[in-house]
Amino acid sequence: MSHIPNGNFPCHNCIQCQNMVKCTSFTHPRTGKEYKVKGRISCRSTYCVYALTCPCKLWYIGKTKRELKTRICEHKWAIRHHDEKSSVARHFNQANHSLGDLRFFGIEIVNMPKRGGDRDRLLLQRECFWIHSLDSMMPNSGLNEENIFTCFL
């Protein structure tokens, strides 16, 4: 049986792949700490936590139950349409970044718990964990506007 490596691997069949970072680990831009990607992630992955990056080295941590490429497409739409409700779009437009500057990679696949449970809640908990671990909150550290810890109650 061959080992399937963890990491980010573009499918090369969609337009979102041009912005995906192919990696097995990533380094925090301010602390220099290295983290390993948890799971094999492509733009077709579901139930994953992901990071968006920009040239300013600010990060946005998000989650999606849908295919990752669908969520990235929504971020790009928000940027193109100057959506003021999106912290990512506001930053990209105020900093005059282009869509080509957007980079993303998956951080972790959230699998169904072995003994059952609420996968959606676990996904939200893992997003909160990564927002905190990577210190991606606005205004100085990142592009996340809020981190809701009620998912742990």
Model-based region annotation:
Residues M1-L153:
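Charged structural interfaces that engage phosphate-rich ligands
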